[in-house]
C-alpha cells in the first residue's frame, strides 16, 4: 500500500496478485477479477462507503447488511442538520467568503499566509493545573499517567468552577466510552463521602452521553456499579445516544434526564465537533430562555487541523477574516499550519536538512512548530471571540490545564457564570 508505505495484511489467492480489497489496483487498472473461474465478475466500491469494495454479483446482498447502511432514526432528539447553522441566524454576519485565492497554488498560498501568522502575537495562556483527590488511587495504579493527569486536572477545574455537584447533570460530547464521566462520578462520590457537598438534591443527578461512533467497553454500567458500591445512596440517570452532534436537538435530549442544571464536558473534542457542540448549545434554550439551567461548559479541545470552515461560528469566521484569513482556501492552509504544532521534529528522523529544504513552506522544524502553535491559538481565539460576542453574563476563557509534556493538546475552553 503506497499511501501507508506497508504491505497489506490480508491474504490473496494464489492466482491473484492482490487481495480482494486491493484487486481494483491491478496492473491493467481494470477492476475485473483475474481468477479464471470468476473472469466475468467485477470488484466495485461500495455505494454506501467507498472505502471498501465488494464483488458486483454480491452487491445487492451486501447493501442489506453493510455497516454503512443508513439507519432510520426514531429518536425524538434527532433533527437532520439542525446544528449546521445557528437558529434564527443568531450571530450571523454577511458572507465574507472571497474567491481571491482560487488562482493560487499551494506554494503561493503558503507564501501569502505564513507572513501573516509570523506577524501575530498572543499573550501566553494561564496555567490552571488542578487535581482531584478522587483520582489519586488511579494515579497510583497506572504506569502511563498522561490520561489520568488530564482527567484529574479537568475534574479539578470542574470543581474549582463550582460545577462538581450531584445537583447537576453532566452531558459529555464526543464521549467515546465515557471514561471522563466515570471519573467525574468517582470524584463526586469521593466529595460526598468527605461531606464536601452539604446541600445536594440527588434526584437531579445524571449523565448524557453523545457520540456518533460505535464504542466498546462503555462505562455506563460501571458508573452505576460505582454508585452501588459506594456508601452514598445515589443512582444517576444515564442516557446515551449514537448521533452526530450536527443532528442533535439538545433540548429534547436533555428533557428526559430532567436536569436541574446542565454541565457540558469533554476531553479532547475533535475538530469541527467543538464548533458543532457550541452551535448545539446556542441553538438550545440553555443560553437563552432557560439560562438558569445552564451550569457551564468545560472541554479540552484538540485536532484543529480537521476543523471545517463551514462549521465555524459566523463570528469566528469574522474574527479570522479580520486577521487576514478570509477564504476557505486560506483556512485550509491555516489548518495545515496547525498540524505543525503537534507534528514537530522526530528524534529518529534522518536527513533532516534535506527534509527541511524539501518542505513546501521552506521552513525548518522549529519554525514550523512555533507557527503551528500560533495558528492553533488563532482558531481557538476565534471561538472565544464568537462566544464573547454572542453571550452576555457569562465568563468565557481558555487556559492550559496540563503541561505540554503530558499532551500537546492541552488547551481547555470554559464557559460559565462563575469566574475562574
Swiss-Prot record:
Originating species: Scheffersomyces stipitis (strain ATCC 58785 / CBS 6054 / NBRC 10063 / NRRL Y-11545) (Yeast)
Primary location class: cytoplasm
Gene encoding the protein: TRM13
One cellular component (GO) term of this entry: cytoplasm
InterPro entries: Methyltransferase_TRM13 (IPR007871), Trm13 (IPR039044), TRM13/UPF0224_CHHC_Znf_dom (IPR022776), Znf_CCCH-type_TRM13 (IPR021721)
PROSITE patterns named in the record: ZF_CHHC_U11_48K
Subcellular location: Cytoplasm; Nucleus, Nucleolus
Binding-site list for Zn(2+): 46, 52, 62, 66
Zinc finger (CHHC U11-48K-type): 43-70
Protein name: tRNA:m(4)X modification enzyme TRM13
Higher taxonomy: Eukaryota, Fungi, Dikarya, Ascomycota, Saccharomycotina
GO BP terms, alphabetized: tRNA nucleoside ribose methylation
EC numbers: 2.1.1.225
Function of the protein: tRNA methylase which 2'-O-methylates cytidine(4) in tRNA(Pro) and tRNA(Gly)(GCC), and adenosine(4) in tRNA(His).
Molecular-function GO terms, alphabetical: tRNA 2'-O-methyltransferase activity; zinc ion binding
Catalytic activity: cytidine(4) in tRNA(Pro) + S-adenosyl-L-methionine = 2'-O-methylcytidine(4) in tRNA(Pro) + S-adenosyl-L-homocysteine + H(+); cytidine(4) in tRNA(Gly)(GCC) + S-adenosyl-L-methionine = 2'-O-methylcytidine(4) in tRNA(Gly)(GCC) + S-adenosyl-L-homocysteine + H(+); adenosine(4) in tRNA(His) + S-adenosyl-L-methionine = 2'-O-methyladenosine(4) in tRNA(His) + S-adenosyl-L-homocysteine + H(+)
UniProt keyword DNA damage, yes or no: no
Amino acid at each position: 500500500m503506497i499511501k501507508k508505505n506497508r504491505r497489506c495484511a490480508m491474504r490473496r489467492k494464489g492466482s491473484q496478485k492482490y487481495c480482494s480489497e486491493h484487486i481494483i489496483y491491478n496492473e491493467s487498472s481494470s477492476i475485473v477479477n483475474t481468477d479464471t473461474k470468476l473472469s466475468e465478475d467485477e470488484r466495485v466500491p461500495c455505494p454506501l462507503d467507498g472505502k471498501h469494495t465488494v464483488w458486483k454479483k454480491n452487491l445487492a446482498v451486501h447493501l442489506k447488511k453493510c455497516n454503512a447502511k443508513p439507519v432510520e432514526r426514531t429518536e425524538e432528539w434527532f433533527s437532520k442538520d439542525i446544528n449546521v447553522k445557528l437558529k434564527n441566524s443568531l450571530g450571523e454576519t454577511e458572507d465574507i467568503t472571497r474567491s481571491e485565492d482560487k488562482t493560487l497554488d499551494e506554494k503561493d498560498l503558503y507564501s501569502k499566509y505564513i507572513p501573516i501568522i509570523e506577524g501575530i502575537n498572543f499573550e501566553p495562556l494561564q496555567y490552571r493545573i488542578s487535581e482531584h483527590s478522587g483520582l489519586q488511587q488511579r494515579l497510583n495504579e497506572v504506569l502511563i499517567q498522561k490520561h489520568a493527569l488530564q482527567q484529574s486536572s479537568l475534574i479539578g477545574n470542574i470543581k474549582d468552577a463550582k460545577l462538581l455537584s450531584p445537583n447537576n447533570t453532566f452531558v459529555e460530547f464526543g464521549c467515546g466510552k465515557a471514561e471522563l464521566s466515570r471519573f467525574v462520578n468517582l470524584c463526586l462520590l469521593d466529595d460526598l463521602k468527605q461531606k464536601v457537598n452539604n446541600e445536594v438534591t440527588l434526584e437531579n443527578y445524571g449523565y448524557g452521553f453523545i457520540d456518533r461512533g460505535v464504542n466498546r467497553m462503555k462505562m455506563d454500567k460501571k458508573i452505576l456499579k460505582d454508585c452501588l458500591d459506594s456508601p452514598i445512596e445515589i443512582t444517576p440517570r444515564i442516557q446515551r445516544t449514537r448521533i452526530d452532534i450536527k443532528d442533535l436537538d439538545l433540548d429534547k435530549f436533555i428533557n428526559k434526564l430532567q436536569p436541574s442544571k446542565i454541565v457540558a464536558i469533554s476531553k479532547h473534542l475533535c475538530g469541527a465537533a467543538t464548533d458543532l457542540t457550541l452551535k448545539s448549545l446556542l441553538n438550545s434554550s440553555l443560553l437563552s430562555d432557560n439560562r438558569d439551567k445552564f451550569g457551564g461548559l468545560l472541554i479540552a479541545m484538540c485536532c484543529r487541523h480537521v476543523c471545517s470552515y463551514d462549521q465555524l461560528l459566523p463570528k469566528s469566521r469574522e474574527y479570522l477574516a479580520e486577521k487576514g484569513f478570509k477564504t476557505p482556501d486560506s483556512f485550509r492552509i491555516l489548518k495545515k499550519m496547525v498540524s505543525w504544532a503537534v507534528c514537530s521534529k522526530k528524534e529518529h528522523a534522518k536527513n533532516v536538512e534535506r527534509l527541511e529544504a524539501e518542505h513546501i513552506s521552506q521552513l525548518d522544524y522549529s519554525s514550523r512548530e512555533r507557527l503551528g502553535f500560533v495558528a492553533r491559538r488563532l482558531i481557538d481565539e476565534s471561538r472565544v471571540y464568537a462566544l464573547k460576542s454572542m453571550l452576555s453574563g457569562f465568563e468565557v476563557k481558555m487556559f492550559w490545564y496540563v503541561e505540554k509534556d503530558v499532551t500537546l493538546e492541552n488547551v481547555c475552553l470554559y464557559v460559565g457564570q462563575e469566574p475562574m
